UniProtKB/Swiss-Prot annotation:
HAMAP family: PurH. Disulfide bonds: none annotated. This is Bifunctional purine biosynthesis protein PurH. One of its GO terms (biological process) is 'de novo' IMP biosynthetic process. Keywords: Acetylation, Hydrolase, Multifunctional enzyme, Purine biosynthesis, Transferase. GO terms for molecular function: IMP cyclohydrolase activity; phosphoribosylaminoimidazolecarboxamide formyltransferase activity. It comes from Escherichia coli O157:H7. The IMP cyclohydrolase activity resides in the N-terminal region. One of its GO terms (cellular component) is cytosol. It catalyses: (6R)-10-formyltetrahydrofolate + 5-amino-1-(5-phospho-beta-D-ribosyl)imidazole-4-carboxamide = 5-formamido-1-(5-phospho-D-ribosyl)imidazole-4-carboxamide + (6S)-5,6,7,8-tetrahydrofolate; IMP + H2O = 5-formamido-1-(5-phospho-D-ribosyl)imidazole-4-carboxamide. Belongs to the PurH family. Residues 1-148 form the MGS-like domain. PROSITE patterns: MGS.
Length: 529
């Protein structure tokens, strides 16, 4: 049974006024009586709409600079009153039923994100009456529709037109879910902010006040259900943040291909985040969350050709990411050369999409352009807990490197060192990357000992016939022994970039000097587990 409820009276009180005038006009045109508060009421009146101020309805004025507006029995009784059960009480106290509540809340997140926001500013942007009305209406969804998203306005009017001015129970229930999600996210933001302010109240420094909150509340929205998880016996879904501030796999639009799998999304994220590190036209090919080929070039076609050469075997069935628009020539090269699961780029030309359309199973994603990297949090689930840390946005420039060996690197060695240092950040530890002329020539990933990662990188380069002599090597963490340097020298490496910091740094540097290798210290580690 649809259990339709007619909408005869609506209360509108919004902070974000986008679309509210048009929505109110549509409601009024359909005979809905409008109640409103403060700035919303003034806006509607200015537009010539018949609107009753809540203070006129309740007989009680707004007070305390707007802190008390809607906290009144005639408001909440009208929202919470059960039709057919509380009618006599409502009539006795002259409480009019309110059939729809349209509310969005004070902009707390935007307020605290502003530079120089004080605790007092934040406190004044904590909405009290709004969430109370939202929760009241959502609780009584059997009789009342609660609208918290402007994106729902058009659909609501259409349903009212299709149902003689009424909304179905299914719609009211769906709106109630959105309402509770809305207030949960809002309260979570406030709790996180206040939790991070605790040290300041204890007289600690401003730096201490920026620590993680003592309770972490997270809100993500389901974007899609997956066929299965990492393995076919695991169920899975993909959730995203509500307001993602940076182009990412979460914001990407799929323009063709089969539905993305759990592993597709994880691997695409790894590829895209790596390619973002480069200003020049770049290509990153990823397999099982590890780069297997990375290059920069004069064009993305040049970059792709060179990245593919690193490890054609592993590139089969991989994920390919670019930091420039996918063009027809590059699309044709990929489709003609290899099987690929996903291609992601900021955009794709019409000609490129015509070419990829010949391979309908290939997933093509466009994510838009990105600017500076946005600070945020990384999470790692452990059984019974959650590890939280800042995103690893650390990187070094040439001026920050320390040459610790007798020999200085050549200009090309230095360029290659900085290039493979960027790549190593995205390779699972222990990570070793060989690079020459702005392309990877060997990658050793995920080994339990660093020396074996170095050996594997050399083996991969040899297997593909790539010349290691004169190349640079990056290590995501320090070398605990000289054996990694000996392995690199045996392969032909002439420059090493690494964090330094081992108790055996002197032995490692001495080994580099013995082999005539230039060594650079970054004083920054890039573990990736």
């Amino acid at each position: 049974m649809q259990q339709r409820r007619p909408v005869r009276r609506a209360l509108l009180s919004v902070s974000d006024k986008a679309g509210i005038v048009e929505f109110a006009q549509a409601l009024s045109a359909r005979g809905v009586e409008l109640l409103s508060t403060g700035g919303t009421a003034r806006l509607l009146a200015e537009k010539g709409l018949p609107v009753t101020e809540v203070s006129d309805y309740t007989g009680f004025p707004e007070m305390m600079d707007g802190r008390v507006k809607t906290l009144h029995p005639k408001v909440h009784g009208g929202i919470l009153g059960r039709r057919g059960q509380d009618d006599a009480i409502m009539e006795e106290h002259q409480i009019q039923p309110i059939d729809m509540v349209v509310v969005n809340l004070y902009p707390f997140a935007q307020t605290v994100a502003r530079e120089g926001c004080s605790l007092e500013d934040a406190v004044e942007n904590i909405d009290i009456g709004g969430p109370t009305m939202v929760r009241s209406a959502a609780k009584n969804h059997k009789d009342v529709a609660i609208v918290v998203k402007s994106s729902d306005y058009d659909a609501i009017i259409k349903e009212m037109d299709d149902n003689e001015g009424s909304l179905t129970l299914a719609t009211r229930f769906d709106l109630a879910i959105k309402a509770f999600e809305h207030t949960a996210a809002y309260d979570s933001m406030i709790a996180n902010y206040f939790g991070s302010m605790v040290p300041a109240y204890h007289g600690e420094s401003k730096e201490a006040a920026g620590r993680f909150p003592r309770t972490l509340n997270l809100n993500f929205i389901k974007k899609q259900d997956m066929r299965y998880g990492e393995n076919s016996h695991q169920q899975a879904a993909f959730y995203i943040e509500e307001n993602v501030k940076e182009a990412s796999v979460a914001t990407a639009t799929q323009v063709q291909g089969k539905a993305l799998s759990y592993n597709n999304i994880a691997d695409t994220d790894a590829a895209l985040e790596c390619v973002k590190e480069f200003a020049e036209p770049a290509c990153v090919i990823v397999k099982h969350a590890n780069p297997c080929g990375v290059a920069i070039g004069n064009s993305i076609l040049d970059a792709y050709d060179r990245a593919y050469k690193t490890d054609p075997t592993s590139a089969f069935g991989g994920i390919i990411a670019f930091n420039r628009e996918l063009d027809a020539e590059t699309a044709q090269a990929i489709i003609s050369r290899q099987f690929v699961e996903v291609i992601i780029a900021p955009s794709a030309s019409e000609e490129a999409l015509k070419i990829t359309a010949a391979k309908q199973n290939v997933r093509v994603l466009t994510c838009g352009q990105w600017g500076e990297r946005v600070p945020g949090l990384d999470f790692k689930r452990v059984n019974g807990g959650l590890l939280v840390q800042d995103r690893d946005l650390g990187m070094v420039g040439a001026e920050e490197l320390r040459v610790v060996t007798k020999r200085q690197p050549t200009e090309q060695e230095l360029r290659d060192a900085l290039f493979c240092w960027k790549v190593a950040k995205f390779v699972k530890s222990n990570a070793i990357v060989y690079a020459k002329n702005n392309m990877t020539i060997g990658i050793g990933a995920g080994q339990m000992s660093r020396v074996y990662s170095a050996k594997i990188a050399g083996i991969k380069a040899a297997d593909e016939g790539l010349e290691v002599k004169g190349s640079s090597m990056a290590s995501d963490a320090f070398f605990p022994f000289r054996d990694g340097i000996d392995a690199a020298a045996a392969a032909g490496v002439t420059c090493v970039i690494q964090p330094g910091g081992s108790i055996r740094d002197d032995e490692v540097i001495a080994a580099a000097d013995e082999h005539g290798i230039a060594m650079l210290f970054t004083d920054m580690r890039h573990f990736r587990h």
